[in-house]
UniProtKB/Swiss-Prot annotation:
Source organism: Suid herpesvirus 1 (strain NIA-3)
Catalysed conversion reaction: thymidine + ATP = dTMP + ADP + H(+)
Binding site for ATP: G10, A11, Y12, D13, T14, G15, K16, S17, R162
GO molecular function, one term: thymidine kinase activity
Top EC class of this enzyme: transferase
Protein name: Thymidine kinase
Active site: E33
Length: 320
């Protein structure tokens, strides 16, 4: 069976989940966010907890160090169900093939969201340490052929309006985190383009600026990163590894952090990353994603029924 798998991703509340549900109405198999795992499966609500840690830090009832530890712990919990699902499904996907898909699976986020993108945004705004970011990013799993990741984009004002209108229990609007996330997802797109062009981070390291506190503060306040046709190293995720905490006195990465970037190259290179504007209606957005499928990679699998069973089991337990 020829299978097309699409990961819809991006900063929260862009409309990706609604778009994915519309695609499911057209016959796609939809894998929702594992909201139950985060909010109701255990004694603690991870979504509310990660916001509560920042509130307590701001009002002085929790130290910055303790808040960072709580946030890193909660961020790891966000990643867990994605990693478990990815580990289960990866062996079921075969080599790339030509021809139209016979099954389309639409995932609400790729593991890169919880292991790399959100941790980096949290590092930018000061919610977690550089060490926590590197540790979480190191858990990003490898990607077999056929990974098509579509990053949702949205006008900044409309994005903030949607976020304020959502009002999920335990959440609050964090404009700095939202700005950081928008920058980080632009970095993800640029990373894919940088790697696809054949460039190597070691060749450009010396020309990239430091990812110091001033740079991070700017990324939390201003939308500085945008998808570029020919990005520089500082426009990519690799630029974050030039944080002073991760380098020696001369600005060179410690060897273990160089290994971390090499691993990131190997894991992200197989992903085909594109963008889509989710400003229009959900039906128009779903059609826009569908229009991109002609350029996406399809894989062969002898386990179509098993994939469907796994997705149904995950959805019944983790969806809300």
């Amino acid at each position: 069976m020829r299978i097309l798998r699409i990961y819809l991703d991006g900063a929260y509340d862009t409309g990706k989940s609604t778009t994915a549900r519309v695609m499911a109405l057209g016959g796609a198999l939809y894998v929702p966010e594992p909201m139950a795992y985060w909010r109701t499966l255990f004694d603690t609500d991870t979504v509310a907890g990660i916001y509560d840690a920042q509130t307590r830090k701001q009002n002085g009832s929790l130290s910055e160090e303790d808040a960072a530890l709580v946030t890193a712990h909660d961020q790891a919990a966000f990643a867990t169900p994605y990693l478990l699902l990815h580990t289960r499904l990866v062996p079921l996907f075969g080599p790339a093939v030509e021809g139209p898909p016979e099954m389309t699976v639409v995932f609400d986020r790729h593991p890169v969201a919880a292991t790399v993108c959100f941790p980096l945004a949290r590092f930018i705004v000061g919610d977690i340490s550089a060490a926590a970011f590197v540790g979480l990013a190191a858990t990003l799993p490898g990607e077999p052929p056929g990974g098509n990741l579509v990053v949702a984009s949205l006008d900044p004002d409309e994005h903030l309006r949607r976020l304020r209108a959502r009002a999920r229990a335990g959440e609050h609007v964090d404009a700095r985190l939202l700005t950081a996330l928008r920058n980080v997802y632009a970095m993800l797109v640029n990373t894919s383009r940088y790697l696809s062009s054949g460039r190597r981070w070691r060749d450009d390291w010396g020309r990239a600026p430091r990812f110091d506190q001033t740079t991070r503060d700017c990324l939390a306040l201003n939308e500085l990163c945008r998808p570029r046709d020919d990005p520089e190293l500082q426009d990519t995720l690799f630029g974050a590894y030039k944080a002073p905490e991760l380098c020696d006195r001369r600005g060179r990465p410690l060897e273990v952090h160089a290994w971390a970037m090499d691993a990131l190259v190997a894991k992200l290179l197989p992903l085909r990353v594109s963008t889509v504007d989710l400003g229009p209606s959900p039906r128009v957005c779903a059609a826009a994603v569908a229009a991109q499928t002609r350029g996406m990679e399809v894989t062969e699998s002898a386990y179509g029924d098993h994939i469907r069973q796994c997705v149904c089991a995950f959805t019944s337990e983790m969806g809300v």
